[in-house]
A protein has these predicted regions:
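Short S/T/G/P-rich N-terminal loop/turn motif that feeds into the first structured element of a domain
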Residues: 1-68, 78-87
Length: 87
């Protein structure tokens, strides 16, 4: 996994996970995300670890009008980290 996204949101964790999986990961990013894993921090916070083959395209998808509207509707705030293997 080379990317970590920490998200806070107003919908439930299950709604967040379902929407992000079906609308974003399996639709918009299906060609650049090879695997992913959700970690529930609490009902309104998630850590998403994923392997992304093109971080530039990921950024473009996250800034798309559809993604921006979804974020606004669900009060979603993302912090994105690139992860590098240390040892």
């Amino acid at each position: 996994m080379n990317t970590l996204i920490i998200s806070t949101f107003s919908c439930t964790f299950e709604e967040f996970k379902n929407d992000v999986t079906t609308l974003f990961l399996e639709e918009m990013c299906k060609e650049i995300v090879t695997e992913y894993e959700f970690v529930k921090v609490n009902e309104h916070k998630s850590h998403l670890l994923k392997n992304c083959t093109d971080l530039e395209k990921l950024g473009a998808e996250m800034e798309s009008p559809f993604a921006k509207e979804w974020d606004k509707k669900n009060n979603c705030k993302d912090t994105v980290y690139s992860i590098k293997l240390v040892a």
